[in-house]
Structure formats: structure tokens, C-alpha cells
Amino acid sequence: MSGHSKWATTKHKKAIIDGRRAKSFAKLIKNIEVAARMGGPDLAGNPGLELAVTKAKKTSVPNDNIDRAIKRGAGLTGEVVDYTEIMYEARGPQGSALLIECLTDNKNRAASEVRLAISRNGGTIADPGSVSYLFARKGVVVLPKNGLSEDDILMAVLEAGAEEVKDSGENWEIHSEPSDLQAIRDALKEAGIDYETDEAEFVPSMQVDLDVDGAKKFMKLVDALEDLDDVQNVYSNADLSEEVQAALDSE
């Protein structure tokens, strides 16, 4: 799930790693195909493709797979790549809100599978606009702290368009407008600071704390959604207190 690192830490113990990795590869490949279709196969002239390829390489997607995806998306193999982006809105346990971002070649299948996963796992599908207003599209760069202070990060990226630096446990998160992501990446490289991920994400304006029971139900719902091939990202305003996280980690 895109968003808070506490979820990633907790879910890591419960995930079947190889299966998740394979699904992650497939979703990264789909992003490359779409970017190549929209802007062509040249990384230098297609920032969206360059970003998709960089992300895939950071996740160890083999170069051969990346090259084939670029050619397929750009129409150089004769195959037709035609995906549609769809966003679904949902309510989860204890007032939590979710945005489910899909990339699909079959809208009816995606709608049916997403609705079924939500209804079977304690959520409810929401009307368009009733959840999305709780989120804003932001560029998010995540980097390990590695002894760096908030001021160290701000000095490196403030002039590149960074809006804020947030403490996210073991990591720092830099938030910006999505259009400033490239400038922030360049500023970090110039400062010699390594980062882990850089994404355009939907960031909640406020977060909702879940108790242990709510967190378990929420993770079950998100797992079911992320298992769907058409689902690219799940964004939420759900959060965990340190006490709830400790209780989950102890199980």
C-alpha cells in the first residue's frame, strides 16, 4: 500500500514475499508500457518513462523485462497495449477512507473485482468525490534517515520545490508538487543523499487512527485489493499509534 511506512513494516511479516514480488513486477511493467505508449520509447525525451524505469530498476525488475515492456508499449512489437486508468473510492473500518487506483484493459472486470473485494472484506464502495476530497496529489520522496536531520534534508531540497519534510519513523518523507519531483531528485543527488522511492501519490489531509481490531480488518481489506492484478495503488488516511503497531507486531 502506498503511504505510511508503519503499514509496510507490519504487513511485511504477513505477506507471502515471492507472490508479492511477482505482482509488484507485473504492475511496474504495466506502468512502463503505459508511459512508453503515451510518450514514446526514448527515456531522455519521456520523463514519465524514465521515472517508471527507474522505479522498476530499484525493485530489481530484470533489464530484459524492462526493454520488452518499452518496445511493447511503444508499439515496436506489433502488440496493442491499451490500458485505462480508473479510480475507485471506498470506506474502510472505523471511518478510514481509501482511494483504489486501477490500470486495466477491461473496465468491467476491474469494477467487478474491486467491488467484490471491498464488500467481502468489511468495506463499502463510496460515491465519486465523497472520499477523494480528503486527499491531495503530491510528489513523495522517501529516504532513510541515515543520521540526517530534518534541516539537512530541507537545506538540500527547499529551493527545488519541497513543501515539507515529514518524520516517518525510520525514514524522512519529502512532500512537493508532483511536477517538482525531478528537481528534488536532482537536488538530492547533487547533495549526495540517497533516496528509496519517489512517487506521485494521493496524500491524506488528515489521518484516522485505528485500534488493533480496526487495523486487522483494514489490512485484510488492503491485502484483498492489492492482490487484484488491475489494482496499481491503494491510498488511505488510516494510521497506527505506536501502541497498536506494537500489539500487531507481537502477534
UniProtKB/Swiss-Prot annotation:
Q: Which cysteines are joined by disulfide bonds?
A: none
Compartments, record wording = Cytoplasm
A Pfam cross-reference name:
TACO1_YebC_N
Top-level lineage group: Bacteria
Which terms does the record give in the GO molecular function aspect?
DNA binding
Q: Which InterPro entries match?
A: Integrase-like_N, TACO1_YebC-like_2nd/3rd_dom, TACO1_YebC_N, Transcrip_reg_TACO1-like, Transcrip_reg_TACO1-like_dom3, YebC-like
Main localization is: cytoplasm
**What's in the keyword line of the UniProt record?**
Cytoplasm, DNA-binding, Transcription, Transcription regulation
Q: Which GO terms of type biological process are on file?
A: regulation of DNA-templated transcription
The protein's matches in SUPFAM superfamilies, at most eight in alphabetical order, are given as: YebC-like (SSF75625)
Entry's Gene Ontology cellular component terms: cytosol
Q: Which family does it belong to?
A: Belongs to the TACO1 family.
By what name is this protein known? Probable transcriptional regulatory protein AAur_2300
Q: Which organism is it from?
A: Paenarthrobacter aurescens (strain TC1)
Recite the lineage of the species.
Bacteria, Bacillati, Actinomycetota, Actinomycetes, Micrococcales
